Amino acid sequence: MRLYRDRAVVLRQHKLGEADRIVTLLTRQHGLVRAVAKGVRRTRSKFGSRLEPFAHIDVQLHPGRNLDIVTQVQAIDAFAADIVSDYGRYTTACAILETAERIAGEERAPAVALHRLTVGALRAIADQQRSRELILDAYLLRAMSIAGWAPAIGECARCATPGPHRAFHVAAGGSVCVHCRPAGAVTPPQGVLELMAALHDGDWAATDDVPQTQRTQASGLIAAHLQWHLERKLRTLPLVERGSRLNMSHGEEQPARSAAG
């Protein structure tokens, strides 16, 4: 079979034999690809560090029966150094990579939008453009939108009556009106659903002065909605740093909190 080339984000890797690794890639045109990088663990490997997680690469592969084989790699963006040097950035980026792999779903299905979104999120984290928690929550909302799982925010999830509505129910699909509100729905504080809408739409100006309590509530709803659709928890989300250490570079000193809200 013929060689093929694609742009990819390295999601994870694990050892294979004495000198090789299996790498999981999120590619633009071929979706999830699992491939063998031969000799990558040797000191003089031709691949160097270009197949480490968080790398954005141009990769050439040889199709295999079960696993493809990496034949060439060129670095496009080296995010890893800026990400792994800080625990908060590292755990946030790990949650993004795990989410990308879970949402990408079947192997070989094109994932142009998800690839673009993932590269943008990693770049924003590495460059410390904004609060890491906001970058992560915006990524999760937009990734769910790509997958067709985005929570309804501006209308009722059940009857589509225009909002704003104050109640939210994960299993119902998001915000719900007073007529459709099921048992167990929560009523988040004023501003929480508005924050979620701003993150989804990229209205960053609307997120600048949002209190930490509202961020906490929004993060909890976003994580719950995502994990309900995935049908099991993400391993990396509980490790994400939240609060003061996460926001110090943005002049905010906030109490630490859990990823699930």
Swiss-Prot record:
GO CC, alphabetical: bacterial nucleoid
HAMAP family given in the database record: RecO (MF_00201)
Keywords: DNA damage, DNA recombination, DNA repair
Pfam families, sorted: RecO_C, RecO_N
Purpose: Involved in DNA repair and RecF pathway recombination.
Family assignment from sequence similarity: Belongs to the RecO family.
Protein name, per record: DNA repair protein RecO
Domain of life (superkingdom): Bacteria
Gene that this sequence comes from: recO
Regions annotated as coiled coil: none
Lineage of producing organism: Bacteria, Bacillati, Actinomycetota, Actinomycetes, Mycobacteriales
Database matches in InterPro entries: ARFGAP/RecO, DNA_rep/recomb_RecO_N, NA-bd_OB-fold, RecO, RecO_C
Gene Ontology BP, a term: DNA recombination
